[in-house]
Amino acid sequence: MKHGIKALLITLSLACAGMSHSALAAASVAKPTAVETKAEAPAAQSKAAVPAKASDEEGTRVSINNASAEELARAMNGVGLKKAQAIVSYREEYGPFKTVEDLKQVPGMGNSLVERNLAVLTL
């Protein structure tokens, strides 16, 4: 009986060791592919960001007191249609902005988001 249990345990341990070795080998083969994909993604993003900055340098500025939500979303970096609509709603409820820094009072607009877009915003 003891020999049977020992044989069973040895067989199971060898089988588990073999399966874990195969799983580790497969995982190490898959990892470089994931790393290559991540490395290629920032390069594509940086290429896409260059044309957007070129249009900002042309002098396209948008008035936060007169622009529609669509215009704000198009001009501001990191602001989608929903946040742009929040800006317009805030403006309609509380009146025109007195400074560009007043955008920080709009829900969802943080300091970094306002600072990032100061170059394209005007009253």
Curated annotation (Swiss-Prot):
Q: Looking at the record, which segments are called Disordered? A: 40-62
Native source organism of the sequence:
Escherichia coli (strain K12)
Domain HhH, which positions? 60-90, 91-120
- Composition bias of kind Low complexity appears in 40-53
Instruction: Supply the PANTHER family for this chain.
Output: ENDONUCLEASE/EXONUCLEASE/PHOSPHATASE FAMILY DOMAIN-CONTAINING PROTEIN 1 (PTHR21180), ENDONUCLEASE_EXONUCLEASE_PHOSPHATASE FAMILY DOMAIN-CONTAINING PROTEIN 1 (PTHR21180:SF32)
Family matches, as NCBIfam families: competence protein ComEA helix-hairpin-helix repeat region
Which Gene3D superfamilies does UniProt cross-reference here?
AF1531-like domain
Q: Does the keyword Endoplasmic reticulum apply?
A: no
GO (cellular component) term, any one:
outer membrane-bounded periplasmic space
Q: Where is the signal peptide?
A: 1-25
**What's the name of the protein?**
Uncharacterized protein YbaV
